[in-house]
Amino acid sequence: MIPRYPSALDDFLFDVRGYLVLEQAADAQLVVDLNQSFDNFPPIKPSGWWGNAQRRDYTVETGFELHNCVEAGEPFERLIDYPGWINYVRHYCGEEKSYVEGLFIDECVASIRRSGGHHPVHSGGYQGALRGRYLYTNGVFRCGQVNIILALGDVGEGDGPTMVIPGSHKANLPNPNHGDYAKGDRMDHLEGAVPVHLKKGDALLFVDGLMHGGSSRTNPHGERRVTIYRYGPLWGVTRYGYEYSQALLDRVTAEQRKILQPVPPNRPSTT
């Protein structure tokens, strides 16, 4: 795939809305290969490990979520610096034009959601964590985390599409109808929230400070399959303490390794 770069219009819309839809961000073969990998996932109980990947569902309603999925096979490794979006995330959260320019993947998830599943709304600019903060200052973007959700099948009405509240990454006040995340409150009818429908191979890019979640999947058949890669500055750490295996670091390209391990360990010589 030819590398894609953000346009001036992309920058404007990202600034105003907090998200972009990258149509056909992934080529057809990658989507096929990822779906085959999903088909081959073994049955993993919650909190169970499969190699260096762990099933860690965000809530009981969110469905099957395999964290550290970059360790789950070669197709997931291709996503690290995929040309359909890598230049976007470098631009928005890679500390462009600074002495710490670069990226780090602090979370990567393979997600399967079936009928009835959803994800409560979370994040938003009000009292938001620095980790997910939106910032544009002195002519550069300085976002704390930018997410890429890649659709491995069409995600339309009733399929449990991601929902967002455009502009909420800049909110200075709390949403009074936010609901209770811990109780699993649904965001389907939250005023201001809109579903983001995707075609197979499309990607949703958004700053983590945007209010977002997953609408209820009402389709009784099939499942919603997506990958979620969260990018941030090179000085970040993985959210849940995962480490990338030495085998993975040795196997990927030099550029990919710089994203997985942008700051190599500094240890004393053993000789």
Show the residue positions of the predicted features:
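Short, P/G- and charge-enriched loop/turn segments at secondary-structure junctions
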Residues: 131-138, 191-192
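Non-heme Fe(II)/2-oxoglutarate
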Residues: 9, 44, 50, 55, ...
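Double-stranded beta-helix
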Residues: 141-145, 154-213
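Short, charged/polar surface micro-motifs in flexible loops or helix N-caps
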Residues: 85, 113-118, 126, 155, ...
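Secondary-structure boundary elements
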Residues: 91-102, 138-142, 152-159
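Short, structured patches in soluble enzyme cores that scaffold and shape functional sites
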Residues: 112, 123-125, 146, 150-154, ...
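Extracellular structured ligand-interaction cores
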Residues: 19, 107, 143-147, 159, ...
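Non-heme Fe(II)-dependent double-stranded beta-helix
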Residues: 1-16, 23-133
